[in-house]
Amino acid sequence: ISAEAPLYAEVGMPALSPTMT
């Protein structure tokens, strides 16, 4: 999910984005 983390962050799910948190 680390690779998809920034994608989730843009979608509106910063909780699933450890790298963007």
UniProtKB/Swiss-Prot annotation:
* Keyword annotations: Acyltransferase, Lipoyl, Mitochondrion, Transferase
Q: List the cofactors.
A: (R)-lipoate
Cellular localisation: Mitochondrion matrix
The entry's free-text remark on the cofactor is: Binds 2 lipoyl cofactors covalently.
Q: Care to name a GO molecular-function term for this sequence?
A: dihydrolipoyllysine-residue acetyltransferase activity
Keyword Acyltransferase: yes or no? yes
Entry EC no(s) = 2.3.1.12
Spell out the GO cellular component terms annotated for this protein, sorted alphabetically and separated by semicolons.
mitochondrial matrix
Q: Reaction catalysed by this chain?
A: N(6)-[(R)-dihydrolipoyl]-L-lysyl-[protein] + acetyl-CoA = N(6)-[(R)-S(8)-acetyldihydrolipoyl]-L-lysyl-[protein] + CoA
- Source organism's superkingdom? Eukaryota
Q: Which family does it belong to?
A: Belongs to the 2-oxoacid dehydrogenase family.
Protein task: The pyruvate dehydrogenase complex catalyzes the overall conversion of pyruvate to acetyl-CoA and CO(2). It contains multiple copies of three enzymatic components: pyruvate dehydrogenase (E1), dihydrolipoamide acetyltransferase (E2) and lipoamide dehydrogenase (E3).
The entry describes its oligomerization and partners as:
Forms a 60-polypeptide structural core.
**What is this protein's name?**
78 kDa dihydrolipoyllysine-residue acetyltransferase component of pyruvate dehydrogenase complex
User: What is the species listed in this Swiss-Prot or TrEMBL entry?
Assistant: Solanum tuberosum (Potato)
